[in-house]
UniProtKB/Swiss-Prot annotation:
This is Enolase. It comes from the Bacteria. It comes from Afipia carboxidovorans (strain ATCC 49405 / DSM 1227 / KCTC 32145 / OM5) (Oligotropha carboxidovorans). SUPFAM superfamilies: Enolase C-terminal domain-like, Enolase N-terminal domain-like. Pfam families: Enolase_C, Enolase_N. GO terms for biological process: glycolytic process. (2R)-2-phosphoglycerate binds at residues 163, 337, 366-367, 388. Pathway: Carbohydrate degradation; glycolysis; pyruvate from D-glyceraldehyde 3-phosphate: step 4/5. Transmembrane segments: none annotated. The active site is at 205 (proton donor), 337 (proton acceptor). InterPro entries: Enolase, Enolase-like_C_sf, Enolase-like_N, Enolase_C, Enolase_CS, Enolase_N. GO terms for cellular component: cell surface; extracellular region; phosphopyruvate hydratase complex. HAMAP family: Enolase.
Amino acid sequence: MTAIVDIIGREILDSRGNPTVEVDVVLEDGSMGRAAVPSGASTGAHEAVELRDGDKGRYGGKGVEKAVEAVSGEIFDAIGGMDAENQVQIDNAMIALDGTPNKSRLGANAILGVSLAVAKAAAESCDMPLYRYVGGTSARVLPVPMMNIVNGGVHADNPIDFQEIMVMPVGAQSFAEALRCGAEIFHTLKGELKKAGHNTNVGDEGGFAPNLPSADAALDFVMSAIGKAGYKAGDDVMLALDCASTEFFKDGKYVYEGEKKTRSRSEQAKYLADLTSRYPIVSIEDGMAEDDMDGWKELTDLIGGKVQLVGDDLFVTNVTRLADGIKRGIGNSILVKVNQIGTLTETLAAVEMAHKAAYTAVMSHRSGETEDSTIADLAVATNCGQIKTGSLARSDRTSKYNQLLRIEQQLDDQALYAGRSALKALA
């Protein structure tokens, strides 16, 4: 009854107006799963490869007709008739069919779309929500949201070199309360920026992109907004950064074009340590560049005992790179992006490896998103305890938050909001 009888691929648009892949998987009993694949702006060099057509006369070369063709053609030919409940077998069959180490032949966008749609179809066939189907009976932890309320770097056209400044409502008693907290801070910040004469346009992920000279200046605005919204920074709400340092790492130096400063790896580590001493920052993502292993080690040794150091470009949701990082003792957390690795099976393996090594895991969106809310279910399924899915504006971001509200309501008194326990540094 759960045999795959049809796979339909199509080209749709993401939140930046670029094409992406959507997949429908239909089972013998009529159940159907649909998944849309996200896309990143700041991509790690070691990520799985999304297949683009390269035809400059169509979507500027960003079309995905080849990936869609692979979905309905080669991939369906290989896994049609297989049992959708055999997720590992199906994902492994697609990996073998592609035959490359980075899924570049068929495209990680094609493979991931099918992988997630298979899981959703199987969940529907079993009459179970996706988080329960993937995570089992223990899936009941609602994640702390990392809400990106100030955008910089490649996500915005402003001088702020860091890509994201986020608020984390760790003191809330429920996810719904955490979401309200974030929304109130977001609207307060908008008023504060407007009052100071700054624009309140939003970036790719729904956060504000004010023309501020430095991360310090942006952090000061956020701290003020937290207080004026009626919350206590460092108690109710903690701060998090995504430096996306690979984007401004040039010739062994960290070049802050907005600040007109250049820092060595040691100076970069000390600068981040200084920020954590002056602001209630409990999580820093990609504080060092993806291949600056010495820098990562220095940063981890300096503040890894008290701050969550998240590897995004460093680990790219890849168990091989994560295992190497664990062995080296660099970072203490992994950012989990399903499209960085390209299958649900490999994503779950990365989370499992992280948890076994006492690393935290943060489920994450991409800057180019869709209305698909699968990662909300996966955050609960994996008991990650943290989710990073943008600001409190743009429906491509709020779709994930709204799905988490539904899950919390469905779980009722079984729901457990992760709160401070999500972060080793606060536990």
